[in-house]
Amino acid sequence: MRERLRPAVERDWPEIAAVLQRHGLPLDGAADHLADFVVAESDEGICGVAGLEVHGEAALLRSVAVVAPGDGLGTRLVTHVITQAEARGIRDLVLLTTTAGAFFPRFGFTAVSRDDVPAALRTSAEFQGACPASALVMRRTSRHAELP
């Protein structure tokens, strides 16, 4: 059965937190932005998640995780969240990753320095220590990128 994507709701938080923890992703600040998260749901429950942390006209793409990688669900989730961001007029997306630097270029993300990140995003929990300083910073501006 193909997973159904839907907006996250408050009652999803325990399952979302479990998926994120299983992948070693930070929980700091995630619950505060749950209204901008999407989950993938199968008959067994939540099997994937991706979220936005919106700060003005820019957003942090965060908390991208799937229970069983390799079936394209991660691509579906990221594409969905990017499309939602663009529909809201958000054209500048940034992410931090320690493990998935090879996954995100297909969506138009390129490596940048922390200094290239909009100031509003540098105040997020992820930039303030939830992600290690060694994390790769990637940025996507929609006017320069096509989705897979």
Regions found by a protein language model. Name each.
Residues 1-29, 41, 135-137, 141-148:
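Short amphipathic alpha-helix that is part of the acyltransferase structural core
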Residues 12, 57, 99-100:
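A generic "binding-loop/recognition-motif" signal
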Residues 39, 44-54, 58-65:
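Conserved beta-strand in the GNAT
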Residues 64-72, 99:
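A short, internal acetyl-CoA/4′-phosphopantetheine-binding micro-motif in the GNAT/acyltransferase core
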